[in-house]
Amino acid sequence: KRLDNVKEISFSEGIKVFGGTAWAMCNSVMKDKLDYLFVDEAGQVSVANLVGMSQATKNIVLIGDQMQLSQPAKGVHPGSAGLSSLKFFLDDAATIPNDKGILLSGTHRLHPEICDFISAEVYDGRLSSEGEAKNRTLKISKGNKSITKEAGILYVPINHYGNSQASLEEADIISEIS
């Protein structure tokens, strides 16, 4: 059932799942209405907004990766209130400590040779490649001299300088190797 106004909500109708924006959760009509509030992409939600949303529940589950997308728009809040809720909660830790939450430690996107590097550099060595990701490889054409392996991270030096927004030199190399 779609609601155009949060004031139309009747939780006596047996609603099991309710989705809404931060603004909907901050509405006084929502006070203590939810058993749990799941905040997806919590790295994009400021502490100030999370505090406002928290009036709807006693249990909050933050979901997301603080290393990915940051807040799309940032308000000016005093102290730490403007930080993303994940950054604030993690207190500069790269990954969630076991006593504070659950890290989904498997990825089905990254080939193991890429994942191993990313895991070591960004995720405290706690991320692993799973499933069919090991089969994600490049087919290298015989005349290609730039790409020397089918999977992993490879440095290809390109001679250019001062390109901050676009690089024709990089585009040319990509065209050559693709």
Q: Residue spans of the language-model regions?
A:
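A substrate-engagement module of RecA-like helicase motors
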Residues: 1-16
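Short, Asp-centered acidic motifs that coordinate Mg2+ and/or phosphate
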Residues: 16-17, 36
